[in-house]
A protein has these predicted regions:
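PLD/PLD-like phosphodiesterase catalytic module centered on the HKD motif
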Residues: 1-161
């Protein structure tokens, strides 16, 4: 059965950076999926030690047509051996904006989903809301939730083209 926690950064004593580090510290994940509208190098550096360990099983989707995401951040993710998809909507009037992190194992998964981008401010300083979902993949609805998330992000016909 799912365990759900609410996080309101900068109003409480909980921070997205800490929760993301916890997610990335579970070394038995078979897959890590990240999606952010904006990524800056300082955001990558704040979780780089944990991400490096899981880089070979990590895929990140990063919005690029937004005047915020930096080439240095994308380069750093690539240096860590993370598979990166740069998502360009083709217009400035629509930006790629989903923010979530998924760690998926054989029997469980953790999802961090909310408003925080992968910038230092987004992970540490801004007032950001999020939910931490700890899922049991033996529960059909929870497995379907994870499978749908992974399929939606990795289906070449939807985002990654």
């Amino acid at each position: 059965m799912a365990k759900l926690d609410f996080l309101l950064q900068a109003v409480t004593d909980r921070f997205h950076a800490d929760e993301l580090r916890k997610l990335l510290s579970q070394q038995d994940w078979k897959r890590v999926l990240g999606s952010v509208a904006f990524v800056l190098k300082d955001g990558v550096e704040s979780v780089a030690p944990q991400l490096k360990v899981l880089a070979k099983v990590s895929t990140f989707f990063v919005g690029i047509r937004n005047d915020i995401t930096s080439m240095q951040a994308i380069k750093r993710l690539l240096e860590l051996d993370v598979q990166v998809y740069a998502v360009d909507t083709g217009t400035r009037s629509i930006i790629f904006h989903p923010k979530l992190f998924l760690g998926e194992g054989k029997s469980d998964a953790t999802v961090l989903i909310g408003s925080a981008n992968m910038t230092f401010s987004g992970l540490h300083n801004n007032v950001e809301a999020g939910a931490i979902l700890k899922l049991d993949l033996a529960v059909a609805d929870e497995k379907r939730f994870v499978d749908d998330m992974v399929k939606t992000f990795t289906d070449q016909s939807s985002i990654a083209q």
